Amino acid sequence: MNIISKKETFYNYIHLWYHLSINKNELFESQGNIKTYREEIIMMLTKRIQNIKPAATLALTGKVAELRKQGIDVIAFNLGEPDFGTPQNICDAAKAAIDAQKTKYTVVSGIMDLKEAICAKFLKDNNVVYKPNEICIGTGAKQPLVNAVLALCEEGDEVIIPTPCWVSYIEMVKLSGATPVLVQNREEDGFALNVEGIKKAITPKTKAIMINTPNNPTGAVYTKEQLTELAELACKHDFYIIS
């Protein structure tokens, strides 16, 4: 009975964890018994999960929806979504795949035809050679990034993250047990990659750096010279570039 009770408590109140993290003061004031639920949930979660903060972008999504429901015209900058629908050729291909019963398990690392197409793209557009066994397919960007961080980083490691950054980077690193080390890209420099700041942040504990270009959210495009210098630093100090 104790196990069932804990499961019921978890499933009934886990949604409160998110809301408490976003606006806990309001909830504590409005419902006197919320604290009990929150404490029960905390006891069930590991320390690494307790360390993770909900994405601010998703919290704003709820706020935007609420304002729009009130008839307020809102421009949302929190999510990187295009202002147009999925192109028809993509919709048609997805439907055709379903109709062809392509709905079963694939090879864990991804469909071979897709991996071969990616290798061809890299050779044509980037002049680099990859083999299909060096390619893994993920569901979107977040899953393979989390996989990479969890595979490479652990407690005692440091991961450099140039900021402003995608909010999920910091939480991914914390989830692995490693420590995020933030290096500010300056607005007065057009948010260019702060290579000098990265140099100062490197320590014997540095395991990786997480970057993307164009940067999310600033849109800054790092130059070939900056990226070459970063690659040289990675080789010199033996850390990974996760991008």
Sequence positions of predicted segments:
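Short, Lys/Arg-enriched N-terminal segments with co-localized hydrophobic residues
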Residues: 14, 18-42
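N-terminal small-domain helix-loop-helix segment of the aminotransferase-like
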Residues: 45-140, 147
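Helix C-cap/helix->beta junction micro-motif
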Residues: 70, 176, 236-237
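Short acidic capping loops at alpha-helix termini that bridge into adjacent secondary structure
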Residues: 129-135, 155-158, 205
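Conserved PLP-anchoring active-site segment centered on the Schiff-base-forming lysine
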Residues: 151-173
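A short helix-loop-beta submotif of the ANL/AMP-binding
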Residues: 175-181
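Active-site phosphate-binding strand-loop segment of PLP-dependent enzymes
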Residues: 186-243
